[in-house]
């Protein structure tokens, strides 16, 4: 393959999976190796769960071989901002006040939708403390840097997600946006990202910012953004604001 695997878009990965010329295991291994190579300088991830990611990738590979893939993003490595619950993992929110030993028993709606779609969830990305900053630096993780220029910020508060995607540490990432926390980092790192209409992507627990804060996709291409949006915009019973009337496809 001429293009290095970690540089491929989600749409390209999905197409190669379908052709059986690339496997989710190969893609996930490439992304994990990329994280190990470059994230010490960038600091986009709070943590990765390599064992879990490879297990998810193996399960996805079986589905693609059997023609029973769950969605176009089945087997595609994905990162989640560390403000959003992921079952079995801590959600530290960039703060030293939260115990790293506290694992959550529930998935946020967006995490649940990603798992239902078969996405390979790699790990959690950095955020300023409780998301209350326009740059991504916190007492817990320090400074997250822009992969295009390590002396520059990647913006905030979803700067970990934007840096991970821009640096090839995964083609898909999830951010949250109240006053620009998806849009600013995407602008700073050359990505596609949107703050969706309130209620289009379900959220739980509800944000302290009320109707201002939304969950949004962060990707290198518009096509990838549309693929991701279609999966995470499915309704969830825990969010009574969520709109189930619109077609995401």
Name every feature range the model reports, one short phrase each:
Residues 2-178:
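Gly/Ser-rich catalytic/binding loops embedded in alpha/beta enzyme cores
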Residues 54, 191-193, 217:
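Conserved hydrophobic/aromatic beta-strand scaffold that supports enzyme active sites
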Residues 75, 191, 214:
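Broad gene-expression machinery/nucleic-acid interaction feature
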Residues 88, 156-159, 186-189, 196, ...:
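Short, solvent-exposed loop/turn segments at the edges of secondary structure
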Residues 91, 132-136, 183-188, 206-207:
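Short acidic, glycine/serine/threonine-rich loops at helix termini
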Residues 100-105, 185-188, 219:
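Short, conserved loop/turn and helix-capping segments at secondary-structure boundaries
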Residues 178-204:
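Glycine/threonine-rich beta-strand-loop-alpha-helix active-site module
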Residues 195-249:
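A short helix-breaking turn/cap at a secondary-structure junction
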């Amino acid at each position: 393959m001429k293009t290095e695997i970690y540089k491929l878009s989600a749409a390209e990965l999905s197409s190669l999976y379908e052709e059986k010329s690339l496997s989710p295991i190969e893609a996930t291994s490439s992304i994990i190796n990329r994280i190990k190579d470059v994230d010490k300088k960038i600091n986009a991830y709070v943590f990765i769960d390599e064992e879990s990611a490879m297990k998810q990738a193996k399960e996805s590979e079986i589905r693609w071989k059997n023609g029973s893939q769950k969605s176009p993003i089945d087997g595609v490595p994905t990162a989640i901002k560390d403000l959003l619950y992921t079952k079995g993992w801590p959600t530290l929110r960039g703060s030293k006040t939260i115990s790293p030993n506290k694992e959550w028993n529930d998935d946020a709606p967006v995490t649940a939708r990603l798992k239902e779609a078969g996405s390979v969830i790699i790990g959690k990305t950095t955020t300023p403390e409780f998301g209350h900053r326009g740059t991504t630096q916190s007492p817990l993780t320090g400074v997250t840097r822009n992969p295009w220029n390590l002396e520059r910020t990647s913006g905030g508060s979803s700067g970990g997600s934007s840096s991970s995607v821009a640096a090839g540490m995964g083609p898909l990432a999830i951010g949250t946006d109240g006053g620009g926390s998806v849009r600013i980092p995407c602008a700073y790192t050359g990505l596609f990202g949107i703050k969706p209409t309130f209620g289009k992507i379900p959220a739980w627990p509800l944000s302290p910012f009320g109707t201002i804060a939304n969950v949004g996709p962060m990707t290198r291409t518009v096509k990838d953004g549309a693929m991701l949006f279609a999966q995470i915009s499915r309704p969830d019973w825990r969010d009574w604001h969520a709109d189930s009337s619109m077609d995401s496809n």
